[in-house]
Amino acid sequence: MAGPRSEHSRQIERSAITALVPVIALVPFWLLALAAVWLPFWLIVGSPFWWFPVAYLVLGLALVIPTIQIALLGTLLGARKPRDEEVDVLRPTWRDLAAKANLPQTRYAVRVIDSDDLNAFACGGHLVIVTSFALTELTPEQVAGVLAHELSHHLGWHTAALTLGHWLSLPVVVLARFGFFLQNVASAATDSYATHSAALTALGRAAALSLTAVSWVFLAALYASDAISNLVGQSSEFEADRRAVRLGYGKPLAEALRVVIRHGGGERPIGWRARLAASHPPARTRVARIEAMMRHPSR
């Protein structure tokens, strides 16, 4: 009885734990970004700093509520409800998948993004996104394999740390962009109004340089967090593939990955920069592993 439960129920997998590493790396910069917002309030009304991170985290708890999460993330991602012809493919596919996973059909929502990319992904804790191009290019069986893989991300809690990381990164992104904006303002003001004074010109240049440096620090933190997330997150793809195989969707998932390969996707990254930027293992590697798991299901 233990085997089926581990395949079908939500269970925190190892990659869900390792996915916390980039989130932890981002926390100091998140706190610094909130400190920049807090400072004016402290100067005016003396607000304690801890109010801001606590309020921000409490606000983020709203994303745990499925209806809010689906509506908010769906809007931010530009996702929509499936059209009638897409429902004809997705409804029976999702119904069968939910039955095999012993889940109510309504626990997770499937949405569509209009895109020419052959892609699908899980986000939040209740949302599965598939592109319109994928629904056009893949057979219903292959779509089922892809959905089984994405559902497996949710069942393994792989998306929890990713959602938290995105939420924490928002103040960092805003502060970095605001810093670059102020740098442009400082440079423009220096060029327009301080050219007559060497001292004012030097002061303006120093201010612009300082703002640029601060902005790049926050931007570098985001890049580093994304790179770490990609490195530790590739194991979650293998774990989701494994669970999809155990649910009985190994063959259609492998076929869907072959379609990705035929379209020129899922290639092995060349060079360290490409490896840091790659969020998924090579598609051929995944196909080989899936086929090996189907040949030796006990491993």
Residue ranges and their predicted role:
Residues 1-119, 172-234, 262-267, 296-299:
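Hydrophobic or amphipathic, alpha-helical segments that drive membrane association/targeting
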Residues 94-98, 233-250:
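An active-site-proximal "capping" alpha-helix that borders the catalytic cofactor pocket
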Residues 159, 163, 235, 239, ...:
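Alpha-helix N-cap and coil->helix boundary residues
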Residues 117-139:
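Active-site scaffold of zinc-dependent metalloenzymes
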Residues 151-170, 250:
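Catalytic Zn2+-binding segment of zinc metalloproteases
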Residues 94, 130, 149, 240, ...:
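Residue-level signature of catalytic and energy-coupling elements of molecular machines
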Residues 217, 223-224, 254-299:
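Long, well-structured alpha-helical subdomains associated
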Residues 139-155:
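Short alpha-helix carrying the canonical HExxH Zn2+-binding catalytic motif
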